[in-house]
Amino acid sequence: KIYRFFNHPTKLILGFFVVTMCVGAAIFWKSRCISWEETVILQENKKEPVKDTSIVYISNCFVGSDMTAHAFDSLVEKVNEKKPDVILFGGNLFGRHTNEVTIDKTLASIKKMKAALGIYMVEGSADSALVEEKKEKISGAGVHLLLDESAVLHNGLQLVGCRADGKTKKPMSYTLSLINKEKPSIVLAGEAMEEKLKEEKKISLVLYPKKITDTGNGGTSGVNQMFPRNVLASAKINFMQIKK
């Protein structure tokens, strides 16, 4: 009977279709689940090291497009369970055409976030215009915008935000010039950065709104890409801990 089933073209095609649908559904379900990664950053050759600091990094949520405001509210609860010292939004929190109601709901959820050293954000390529337009409202939710700016936390950790886009975007070289090389630093980068520049500025960690890796020939390539949209990255959170 098994032989007859697989020997029948129509049934074989149907079986392949069912298996493909099941695999696709499993991948989609997994992509919507929030996953955590832990990274340890060693503060080498720093005259002013910081104490252990827990950081939650969130990017590519595309609220109003890939993620609903309700789903984001659930994400906030999971973040608060981690009890982070700092929360970083690395870009593309909103979609390109997120409406006002969804923006307000999202910001109301952000107000419930708890981070002793604050919440910081840089916009991504998708929401650069929206963030620039709504920056006062976003700041009112307790978010510190790093639009080609730097900030030094109370524990000495530097945060630098390099914008992805926007009419008033400054060159990355200018923003990186704000870094104090004696302090550990995390750069939220909206565009790819050469490895030699990272070494020159003694940057501890560079975070991108999409995972970008060096191809070895001076270029970059995206990883964890899913067709037609990078759904996996939209629900991705990286948990990092700074250590001496």
Where are these regions (language model features)?
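Acidic, histidine-bearing metal-coordination/catalytic regions of metal-dependent phosphoesterases
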Residues: 1-54
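Conserved beta-sheet core of the metallophosphoesterase superfamily
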Residues: 193-244
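Generic detection of short hydrophobic beta-strand segments and adjacent strand-loop junctions
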Residues: 39-41, 151-153, 235, 240
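Membrane-embedded segments
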Residues: 46-144
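Short, well-ordered secondary-structure micro-motifs
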Residues: 2-9, 68, 99-101, 132-134, ...
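N-terminal post-signal-peptidase region of extra-cytosolic proteins
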Residues: 74, 104, 169-174, 224, ...
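Conserved catalytic scaffold of divalent metal-dependent phosphoesterases
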Residues: 44-48, 61-65, 95, 125-207, ...
